[in-house]
Amino acid sequence: MKPWPQLPSDPRLYYFAVPNEIFHSEINASEFAILAYLFSRQMKELPPTNLMTVYKNLGVSRNTMKKYARILESRGLISLRRDKRFLRASVSMRDTITLTDALKVRVGHFFPLPNSVFGFGLSVGEIAVYGYLLYREDRESYECWPSYRTIGAALCMSRNTVMKYVHRLEEKEFIVTEPTQVRRMDGSKWNGNLKYRIRPIQSVVKRWNEKQAEKAKREQKLLRAMKIAEHRPGFTIQPGIPERRPQQRC
């Protein structure tokens, strides 16, 4: 089990910087998540890692990891150093992966992404949509209102796929959405884009850990009930269903 997301003692280390240029060319969710993870390691000044480590932290399949590592290398965004033990394979999970100088963090040309974003078990699609909203976010109001189509065009996703990930992020309390209306020249009102408010990562981490603690308590309670039921014939325990004493026959 992964450790629960924790915040560093220094608030300045809550986030790492991702260059705006990452969205200036075509990129999909898996490619964004891989690059973002490498930027997080770079900011922490961690040593180079291999594909296996990235794969475990992003939750993608091995084939997906290898596929997009090859694509990112061909675009000059990452460098792969081959493991001598696996030279026959085109790409090995033991190959070392590092960022190149093609994408650089420049003053005033980056957006922040929370260091703890990889500890919540988010899918690469959720990470990518969350990252794009942070890219578009107003730094004073913490709001933005890109359309589903705009988000999808930036991440090579369909409108329905974007909607799915937005709803998941809202359910997990990373964002809050609010419908808007626009007034046309003829005075009629039409539904506008959703307005997104990005919740502070401090509150997200706190709420996440509270939910995990509640879940752990429920599981412990169920485990104790199951142990008791093993020694008391006639009892059945099912998750989410309160136990009932069987009726006695006359």
Residues of each region from the PLM?
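Electropositive, intrinsically flexible nucleic-acid-contacting patches
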Residues: M1-C250
